[in-house]
Amino acid sequence: MTKSVIKTVEWSDEGVVLVDQTKLPTEEVYVTCGTYEEVAVAIKDMIVRGAPAIGVTAAMGIALGVRDAKASTLSELRQMFGMICRTMGETRPTAVNLFWAIRRMQRKFEELSNMPLAVIKAEMVFEAKRIHLEDIAANQAMGRNGAVLMPSEGGVLTHCNAGALATAGYGTALGVIRAAVESGKNIRVFADETRPFLQGARLTAWELMKDGIDTTVISDNMAGAMMAQGKIQAVVVGADRIAANGDVANKIGTYTVAVLAKEHGIPFYVAAPWSTIDLDTPDGSKIPIEQRNGREVTHIAGKQMTPDNVRIENPAFDVTPSKYVTAIITERGVAKAPYDESLRKLAETETVSA
C-alpha cells in the first residue's frame, strides 16, 4: 500500500508534536506541545482535530503530564494524574475517542500502581505510543474492509476530513478511499467544503492531492445536485461517536448528506475505529453536541461576513439516524442493520480483522 506520509501527531522527548491544522493548506507548520496543558489547548483550539487523532493526542498529553510530574510519592502522582485526566476530558465533549483514551490510560495507571514511580512514568509513555500504533493499524484494516464496498469506477463524496489528519495516520473514510484506489479502482473524490471550518476544502483536498488522488472540491449546497446528475456513486464519512443503535454523530452537515444519499439511492457508509463505537449510549439523542464560538460562522479568513449582533448557531456536529446508514466500517469488520445486533456481535470479535 502507498501510505500517507502526513504525521498528524508524534511523540518526541521535547513533547507532543502536531501539524497545526488551522494553518493548512497554505502553511505546513508543526508545533511542539511541551506540557499537558498545551496539549489540551491544542485539542480545544482544533490545532489537532478528528476523533481518533484527538484520542491519540490526549493519551500522549496524559503521558507527557505523568512523565514530567514533580511527584515524590505514588499518592502525589495519582493526584496529579487525576488533574491531568480532568483537564483532557474538558477539551471537547462529543468525540468519544477522547474519553476512551482517558479511560485506557487510567486503567494502565492502576495496573502500574505497585511499581516504582520511574517505571510508571516510562510505561505510561509506552502505552500512549502503543495507542498511536494501534490506531494506524486499525485505519489500514478499515481501509481493507471498506475498499470492497467502493464502486469500481465513479464518484465518491466525503464530508469534513476523516483522513490521515484526523487520525494517527492513513485515515478512516479516506483510508477506505486510499485502499480502494490502491486496489485499482478508478475513483474520483468529491470533497464537501464543510462549513464553517472548511475541513473538506482545506484538509481533505490537501491530503488527497498529496497522494495524487483525483479530487474535486464542491460547496456544501452542491451535494444534492451532484447526486441528481449521477456524479456520485457512494458516500463515505467518518464519525465522532456512534451509538449502540447505529446513530452517528459526525461533523455538522453529515445528516443532510445522508438524507440526500437516501433520496437518490446512493449507499452511505461510515468508517470509524472501534474506539468511536459507544455501546453505553443507546441512541443519538443521548450524544452531547459541542457548541463552538460563533465567530467561526461570522468570519472567514478573518473577514466578517454577517451583520453585527446577528444571532449565531454553531453546533460542531449533528446526528444521522441509523436508518440512513448503509453500513458501518470498522477494523473488526463491517456492521449492517440492525446495528444493535451487528455492533454487539463485532464487540466480541478480534481487535483487528485479518
From Swiss-Prot:
InterPro entries tied to this protein: IF-2B-related, IF-M1Pi, IF_2B-like_C, Initiation_fac_2B_a/b/d, M1Pi_N, NagB/RpiA_transferase-like
EC number: 5.3.1.23
Pathway(s) it belongs to: Amino-acid biosynthesis; L-methionine biosynthesis via salvage pathway; L-methionine from S-methyl-5-thio-alpha-D-ribose 1-phosphate: step 1/6
Catalyzed reactions: 5-(methylsulfanyl)-alpha-D-ribose 1-phosphate = 5-(methylsulfanyl)-D-ribulose 1-phosphate
Keywords: Amino-acid biosynthesis, Isomerase, Methionine biosynthesis
Primary enzyme class: isomerase
Site location (Transition state stabilizer): C160
Chain positions recorded as substrate binding sites: R49, G50, A51, R92, Q199, N250, K251
GO biological process terms on file: L-methionine salvage from methylthioadenosine
Transmembrane segments: none
Coiled-coil positions: none
Active site: D240
One Pfam family this sequence matches: IF-2B
Gene Ontology molecular function, alphabetical: S-methyl-5-thioribose-1-phosphate isomerase activity
PANTHER family cross-referenced by the UniProt entry: METHYLTHIORIBOSE-1-PHOSPHATE ISOMERASE (PTHR43475:SF1)
HAMAP family assigned to the protein according to its UniProt record, in alphabetical order: Salvage_MtnA (MF_01678)
Protein's job: Catalyzes the interconversion of methylthioribose-1-phosphate (MTR-1-P) into methylthioribulose-1-phosphate (MTRu-1-P).
Similarity comment: family membership: Belongs to the eIF-2B alpha/beta/delta subunits family. MtnA subfamily.
Name by which UniProt lists this protein: Methylthioribose-1-phosphate isomerase
Biological source species: Koribacter versatilis (strain Ellin345)
